[in-house]
Amino acid sequence: MRSASPRPSVTGALFSLMLVLGACSGGADGTPAGSTSRDDCARVEDGVITITADDLAFSAPCMVATAGEAFTIHFENLEAQVHNVSLYTDSSKGNELMRGETITGPDAEVDYAVEALEAGEYYFDCMVHPAMSGTLFVEA
């Protein structure tokens, strides 16, 4: 009687390799997997970052500001929903840095003053719709 020896499946091995390579690879622009390219970010211009809300999403997945410089977030709500922008040290929301006033659109806008921040990554979201979120990069 012959004992059956386990044989590795070529298909299974290739599938496993594809999963590992996919999980470890970054974006085509060199950004790590799961991160956002800063090319897509809203940036400070003359002390103001403009970001909008429409179709339950922010117009940019991230914002970029300069360390040590206060700035304003000019927020435009383009839809008939209640939205705001709030800023935290991280996604746990344990340390709130700025809670923006909620506004109802369409075509409503407000300016939020943000005090100077240290270089680093911060988290922002809409308190009413937490899936609307992004990263604020503060660069030295």
Give residue spans per PLM region.
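Beta-strand cores of secreted/periplasmic/IMS beta-sandwich domains, seen most often
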Residues: 61-81, 85-86, 110-124
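C-terminal motif of bacterial Sec signal peptides marking the signal peptidase cleavage site
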Residues: 20-23
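Histidine- and aromatic-enriched segments that form or immediately flank copper-ligand environments
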Residues: 80-106
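Bacterial Sec signal peptide processing site at the extreme N-terminus
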Residues: 26-39
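N-terminal edge beta-strand
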Residues: 41-70
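Non-cytosolic beta-sheet module surface loops
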Residues: 55, 75-77, 128
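Extracellular/periplasmic metallocenter environments
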Residues: 25-28, 43, 57, 104-140
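Bacterial N-terminal signal peptides that target proteins for export
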Residues: 2-14
